[in-house]
Amino acid sequence: MRIVFMGTPSFAEVILRALVENEDKKIEVVGLFTQRDKPFGRKKELKAPETKTYILENHLNIPIFQPQSLKEPEVQILKGLKPDFIVVVAYGKILPKEVLTIAPCINLHASLLPKYRGASPIHEMILNDDRIYGISTMLMDLELDSGDILESASFLREDYLDLDALSLKLARMGATLLLSTLKNFHSITRKPQDHMQASFCKKIAKADGLVGFKDAKNLFLKSLAFKSWPEIFLENSLKLLEVELVENEKSHKEGEILAIDERGVLVGCLKGSVRIARLQAVGKKPLKAKDYLNGRRLKVGGILT
C-alpha cells in the first residue's frame, strides 16, 4: 500500500511517524508533501515543518516536496509516485480536483464531523467546554471538510487539557484510527455528513488572546486553548500564565485582587475567580505573580489591569 502523506505541524508528525513505524510492512510512505520552511523567532531563521524534520533526522528514504501550490508540475509528480492513498493531516493547502482524482484522499480531521469544520477544531473543543473529544477520518471532496465520514473515535473528558496535551492525545488516537481506515477502506460503509448540523471554526488570530475579567470559566478555557499561541493577555498586553479556575459563581469587581500568596494571585471576575501563577509584561521575562505585584505595589483590594 503506497501512501503519499500531506501534513505539516507536530500533530501531523505523530501520524506520519505511526505510518512509517507501523509493523505492517504493507504500508509504505512514498512521499511527503508539506509547507515550506518559514521564518521563526526574533532572528527570523528558517524553521522546517515538524514532518520534514522527522524524515531528515531519521535519515528516511522518503522524498520531500514543499510546493507553493498543487498545480502542474506537482500533479504529475504525484501521479509519478503512484499512490494507493493520499493521506492529508493538517497540511494547510486545499487539494484541487486534479489531485483528488489521483487516488482516494483521506483526511484525518480533529473533530467529530460535521462539528468544527475548518482550521482550529481542537481550540473550539476546549473553548466550548466540550465533554466529548473526538477525531474523524473522511474521504475528501472539493468542499471544506464536507466529505463522507469513514470512521471516528472519541473519549469522555475526565480532566481539563490544554491545547498541547489534547492535541497529542488526539493525534495518538488519530494514528490508530487512520491505520484502521487504511486497512479496512474497501469494506467501510461511508456515512454522508449531515450538512445541516455542520459548525465551522476559523484560523486563530493574535487578537483572540485578548481577555478581560468578566467570566472566570471563559478566561480559563481561553488560557488552555491559546497556551502555545497567542497566549492570553489584557488590554495593556500583560500576559496571564498558568491560570487556574477557582470558582465560577460568586460576583466580584472586574480584576479585583482577592488574595496573594506563593501559588499566585487570586483575581475576581464579574462571574467567578481565577488564580494566576505568573505574569509577564511586554518585553520582560515571566515573573511569579507575587513578585510582579510587589514591583507594581499592587495589594489585596487593588485592580489588576
Swiss-Prot record:
Domain of life: Bacteria
InterPro entries xrefs: Fmt, Formyl_trans_C, Formyl_transf_N, Formyl_transf_N_sf, Formyl_transferase-like_C_sf, Met-tRNA-FMT_C, Met-tRNA-FMT_N
Entry keyword set: Protein biosynthesis, Transferase
Annotated residues for binding of (6S)-5,6,7,8-tetrahydrofolate: S111, L112, L113, P114
Catalytically driven reaction(s): L-methionyl-tRNA(fMet) + (6R)-10-formyltetrahydrofolate = N-formyl-L-methionyl-tRNA(fMet) + (6S)-5,6,7,8-tetrahydrofolate + H(+)
Molecular function terms, GO-annotated: methionyl-tRNA formyltransferase activity
Keyword Cytoplasm listed: no
GO CC, any one term: cytosol
EC number(s) stated in the UniProt entry for this protein: 2.1.2.9
Signal sequence interval, chain numbering: none
Family classification: Belongs to the Fmt family.
Its job: Attaches a formyl group to the free amino group of methionyl-tRNA(fMet). The formyl group appears to play a dual role in the initiator identity of N-formylmethionyl-tRNA by promoting its recognition by IF2 and preventing the misappropriation of this tRNA by the elongation apparatus.
Name the record gives this protein: Methionyl-tRNA formyltransferase
Record organism: Helicobacter pylori (strain J99 / ATCC 700824)
Name of the encoding gene: fmt
